[in-house]
Amino acid sequence: MGIKYSSKINKIRTFALSLIFVGVIVMYLGLFFRTSPIIMTLFMVLGLLFLVASGIVYFWIGTLSTRAVQVVCPSCGKVTKMLGRVDLCMFCREPLTLDRELEGKEFDEKYNKKRKN
């Protein structure tokens, strides 16, 4: 079984969503320390920081998403956004590229790394 890829925008959104869950869980763990207000406050503040970080990531991916190149997927025909030289369709996971050199090659996220000259 091969590596399961996802579009870059969806990966970043998933990361931001996981930050929300981590923040809520950390705040919930703080409730177990109700007898110690200092420890409980630390957990609550740490959880709040995770939630704020999530908001920052969501804002960042939103601004990045507005600048992403929109292409029509040849497989499903839906408009999807591309970041980098290669990306996947958000809907059907079809490998997409705007680089003529990479057409027909096996999909690999390494193509998005900057080349050292």
Curated annotation (Swiss-Prot):
Keyword hit for Membrane: yes
HAMAP family documented for this protein: UPF0295 (MF_01502)
InterPro entries xrefs: UPF0295
GO CC annotation, single: plasma membrane
Family that this chain belongs to: Belongs to the UPF0295 family.
TM segment ranges: 12-32, 42-62
Species this protein is from: Geobacillus thermodenitrificans (strain NG80-2)
Pfam families: DUF2614
Compartments it resides in: Cell membrane
Entry keyword set: Cell membrane, Membrane, Transmembrane, Transmembrane helix
Name of the protein in its database record: UPF0295 protein GTNG_0491
Entry membrane topology: Multi-pass membrane protein
Principal subcellular localization: membrane
Recorded superkingdom: Bacteria
